[in-house]
Amino acid sequence: MKLNLAVKIGQLDMINPVTTASGTFGYGQEYSPYVDLNQLGAIVVKGTTLEPREGNPTPRLVETPSGILNSIGLQNSGVDYLLEHYVPFFKKLQTNVIVNISGNTAEEYGQLAARLDEADGIAALEVNISCPNVKKGGMAFGGDFRTAAEVTKVVKNSTALPVIVKLSPNVTDIAEIARAVEGAGADGLSVINTLLGMAIDVRKRKPVLGNTMGGLSGPAVKPVALRAVWQVYKAVHIPIIGMGGIMNATDALEFILAGAQAVSVGTANFVNPYATKEIIQGMEKYLMENGIGDINELVGAAHL
């Protein structure tokens, strides 16, 4: 049986539905000894800001039951460094390179999108709207449908690249925000970003993370992420990249059945650098065993 694993996220053609979560795969180079990057549907690289950022105080990572808390604080060398040092590598790849962007203001997102729009080797932008809005007292852009839509619109007006907006789960109604972002022109959605959490050292009687709170990822968040994908799929008509605790092909297939067109592998990369490759192989095996020729037949099939 000939299998079709190819999917589309807006104008983005992917040879299969598997990509990587920003911040867990570096800039691709770090994992190239383990995985043929060109065999992935896409790679999403580490988050980029307009100016270099040092990130949050240490410790920045702590293991929790079935997950990891991280508080990296968007440490990166800034967009100029990305364009000079990483884009030449991106140009050599056949796979789609998606750059994750963050800003302190809507204007910063727009400036960043415009800079990246000029570069070859970048296939799409993923917009992290979980950042604090410095003009609105630090509330996350993604916490309110109006500011989420505003950032989306500014980015869309600043680039011809496909725009994928990464939604925060730390909200009351994720479907409302998804609809607002779709209305503002988003080409796709990444669902979900990390859940806000913390850990406390009982000996020191202090939070473990240097920044007190951090983002929870890994298997612990999977039921929440699946629920979010299910709700968003029913609310919008644009494609979804599902993520949150995907460790194997079975996890990935659950997200696709819930409505995700593609899936993003994050924490699993830390545990097993071959995770993405093994998930693709597991998907192929499932399709063969079940007599399904096209992965797209499974998208949202659990809703039927």
Curated annotation (Swiss-Prot):
Where is the protein found, in the record's own terms?
Answer: Cytoplasm
Q: List the disulfide bonds.
A: none
What does this protein need as cofactor?
FMN
CDD domains listed in its UniProt record:
DHOD_1B_like
Q: What is its main location?
A: cytoplasm
UniProt cross-references to InterPro entries, sorted A to Z: Aldolase_TIM, DHO_dehydrogenase, DHOD_1B, Dihydroorotate_DH_1, Dihydroorotate_DH_1_2, Dihydroorotate_DH_cat, Dihydroorotate_DH_CS, Dihydroorotate_DH_I
Q: Which UniProt keywords apply?
A: Cytoplasm, Flavoprotein, FMN, Metal-binding, NAD, Oxidoreductase, Pyrimidine biosynthesis
Binding site residues for substrate = K46, N70, S71, I72, G73, L74, N128, N193, T194
What note does UniProt attach to the cofactor annotation? Binds 1 FMN per subunit.
Kindly state which reaction or reactions the protein catalyses.
(S)-dihydroorotate + NAD(+) = orotate + NADH + H(+)
Q: Which residues form the active site?
A: C131 (nucleophile)
Identify the EC number(s).
1.3.1.14
Biological processes annotated in GO: 'de novo' pyrimidine nucleobase biosynthetic process; 'de novo' UMP biosynthetic process
The pathway entry for this protein reads as: Pyrimidine metabolism; UMP biosynthesis via de novo pathway; orotate from (S)-dihydroorotate (NAD(+) route): step 1/1
> Which Pfam family, just one, is annotated for this protein?
DHO_dh
Positions annotated to bind FMN: S22, K46, G47, N100, N128, K166, I192, G218, G244, G245, G266, T267
Q: What class of enzyme is it?
A: oxidoreductase
Tell me which HAMAP family the record gives: DHO_dh_type1
The function of this protein is: Catalyzes the conversion of dihydroorotate to orotate with NAD(+) as electron acceptor.
The annotated subunit structure for this chain is: Heterotetramer of 2 PyrK and 2 PyrD type B subunits. However, the metal reductase complex seems to be composed of a heterooctamer of 4 PyrK and 4 PyrD subunits.
Write down what this protein is called. Dihydroorotate dehydrogenase B (NAD(+)), catalytic subunit
Q: Which organism was this protein described from? A: Desulforamulus reducens (strain ATCC BAA-1160 / DSM 100696 / MI-1)
